[in-house]
UniProtKB/Swiss-Prot annotation:
It comes from Desulfitobacterium hafniense (strain DSM 10664 / DCB-2). This is Small ribosomal subunit protein uS5. The keyword rRNA-binding applies. GO terms for cellular component: small ribosomal subunit. It comes from the Bacteria. InterPro entries: Ribosomal_Su5_D2-typ_SF, Ribosomal_uS5, Ribosomal_uS5_bac-type, Ribosomal_uS5_C, Ribosomal_uS5_N, Ribosomal_uS5_N_CS, Ribsml_uS5_D2-typ_fold_subgr. Residues 11-74 form the S5 DRBM domain. The keyword DNA-binding does not apply. PROSITE patterns: RIBOSOMAL_S5, S5_DSRBD. With S4 and S12 plays an important role in translational accuracy.
Amino acid sequence: MAKIDASKLELTEKVVHIARVAKVVKGGRRFSFSALVVVGDGHGNVGAGLGKAGEVPEAIRKGMEDAKKNMVSVPLIGTTIPHAILGNYGAGSVLLKPAAKGTGVIAGGAVRAVLEVAGVSDILTKSLGSANPHNMVNATMAALKSLKRAEDVARLRGKTVEEILG
């Protein structure tokens, strides 16, 4: 998979989750913030990142930088994905199914954010297991990374697309 140069893309970002986290030290607690951010160009490129800092805006900025470093390309067929897929991360699983035009994004919070910035506008999803935003975002990213076009599968197997699709 080729590395995506985020500097050449017009990216939109969404903050999925912000948490105040604490480090317990001898003198009490040290508070900081972590921000889970997704970025995408709306045309099949998407990335997710985690930023941690003492202040919220700085954590969001760091999350955006991390997300730009972890971008993947999603094969889209029109406004949906080529086939159904199950993505796993930790105890969270996300089922993604292609949908007819006009269906919209049927998804929960964290999964919806990833799909919207990726440019998927018609999809059915089901979140299974953990509802933790980190697990949901990473499971969605894992599913999107695993998607393949019929042409690519046919080329790998040395067959025609018609033979693959039956």
